[in-house]
């Protein structure tokens, strides 16, 4: 009977393994509550060996959150195919897939904390927000956004973050409802801005022109009209 020989990992392969193990642990508990000993045990190596690949706890956490940030930023990439509302809903579905699968890690990434409060980690969060901003503009077909559109998009990204964090705290509102609501929120923010600025009005009209009569943005307009008091 032969005994299998454990293959020795290369440096980069081992680093990637440790990052993956850390992210898996972060999906269940905050990075602040995960120790290097736990990461080492889950990876099947000794604590000193972890420090051979990462100089300290913070450097491992930052590497893990870098991968998570790259993953999250990628969730906003969407082909320009189909109505704008439907495309945005697909993006929100992938966004909440990430939030659902990396709850404590997502919360730590967005809120910061002792383990993840460095300037490097803050820069990671900013990079995710910027990637989301660029992708939304691409969906709108705009490369040089006017100031009011930038305000709308960045405000909406902040709203999506806050909504996800609140949802994680008890999940008291159905996820599918929030995904749809965030699409409507984007349309509402754009509509309010369009009501006060002609340049935004042109952009909003162009978006609505690509929406079918039963699309998500049209649905919001119908719901708002239904809320208006009926004239006697």
Where are the regions that the model predicts?
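Basic, helix-initiating cap at the start of DNA-binding domains
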Residues: 1-29, 33-44, 58-62
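C-terminal peripheral helix-coil segments that are non-catalytic and often amphipathic
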Residues: 1-2, 134-138, 169-232
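Short hydrophobic/aromatic patch on the recognition helix
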Residues: 43-54
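Alpha-helical DNA-contacting segments of helix-turn-helix folds
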Residues: 59-68, 109, 124-128
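Short, Lys/Arg-enriched C-terminal cap helix and immediately downstream tail that follows
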Residues: 62-63, 73, 190
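Hydrophobic alpha-helical connector segments
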Residues: 63, 77-104, 142-146, 179
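Amphipathic alpha-helical segments used for helix-helix packing
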Residues: 98-122, 133-137, 161-169, 199
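Amphipathic alpha-helical packing segments from all-alpha helical-bundle domains
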Residues: 117-143, 149-162, 176-191
